[in-house]
């Protein structure tokens, strides 16, 4: 039997008794990073006085999926008590476990997903922004045109948007939002359920000022409210050119939505 097991996103007390029971019985653990999972098991054994001791560990991530499924004996997923554990939170949400779900479905392997901690739902509940519909984008592309387009799509969404972001890029994300829509309401939370959990909610411009004087360490979850203009359409280069703004500022805005070099755009505008 194959179980998909959610792990705490910070606070060990958030793991359920059912998850602990399955962990104690499991023979095989599949996970993204075996070091992270082994460390978690050590902590759980110490905290709850357990004897979690799976016989085998296997790593499954985006770089070894094909090799893993080519070599792993699928019969063992049916005859052994197997667990797929995420590094933190719910499996298969911005997580390579999704490929194992598909594999189980394609091969008629029974599986069960246990309930547990989930960072995006915690952020949704804490935001005061989301009531029903929302869009979850996971992690955005890191650089260039793809990232600029992804941010613009998020701002043009008909629904509030939830994004995962790293401490290295959280400031640039809020800066990009403030440049396109300074008054857009944004909620952000880091280190959720941990000792140094921190939450902020403000307009994008004011939030940027707050963050410039804050400790940015930790993984962030960002909730962007939908635009106050429900009929908002995608901003185009033509829209920006029609604005009463200095050419340098126009060049920067065009760069944000196209991913092209701002200096090159500016040179084209003045020639």
Curated annotation (Swiss-Prot):
Q: Which GO terms describe its cellular component?
A: cytoplasm
Signal peptide range in chain numbering = none
The main place the protein resides is cytoplasm
Task: List, in alphabetical order, the Gene Ontology terms for molecular function in this entry.
Answer: rRNA (cytosine-2'-O-)-methyltransferase activity
EC number of the protein: 2.1.1.198
Enzyme class comes to transferase
What catalytic activity does the UniProt entry give for this protein? cytidine(1402) in 16S rRNA + S-adenosyl-L-methionine = 2'-O-methylcytidine(1402) in 16S rRNA + S-adenosyl-L-homocysteine + H(+)
Which UniProt keywords are given for this protein, alphabetically ordered? Cytoplasm, Methyltransferase, rRNA processing, S-adenosyl-L-methionine, Transferase
Subcellular localization is given as:
Cytoplasm
This chain's protein is named Ribosomal RNA small subunit methyltransferase I
Q: What organism does the record attribute this protein to?
A: Campylobacter fetus subsp. fetus (strain 82-40)
